[in-house]
């Protein structure tokens, strides 16, 4: 892609990170960069209809020069942090429409959409979206997690419990692949007043947190030891 507007996009991206560094309350540069990115892609597709059909292909076709995926994640995070939920919802919908998302991909975007809808009080809409998503991807734990939050908001506790029972096979074993749904289950049991089930889930979450803390502490120690190994004084060398 040799669209001259990429230079303008790059400048706007720089403005976005300056915006972060200075804690500016103005989010215009993020929205401007997002809209310009859409504009560039749609312009390219006028002459090359199949260009950038997926986000990963866009990165490849721009030689990974702009870290578009990384910037988009930061952009969505920023809208979320600023509680700009209408803008966040629109961005998620635009990205889900702009690119192709094969099954079991785009889960982060779809979860963000559900949470944006819930934050806007559009609970039934969030519930309906999660149901359609889970129907297409019945083993997607991200869809189920989003669904549990939607069930809490709509007070559909029967459906929420069904999701927990199906996706949490062992309530005592929380790990990297299912910690998000354990967190959702904890919120669910808090909402339903099931103290016994919440205590069991929270115990598993705590055990996993302690495991992670120990793991990263040991990794830090190993890195420190490795640095010491290579910190050799010149006088200790066997020869000049």
Which residues make up each language-model segment?
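Acidic, Ser/Thr- and Gly/Pro-rich intrinsically disordered linkers and low-complexity segments
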Residues: 42-65
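Alpha-helical adaptor scaffolds
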Residues: 65-173
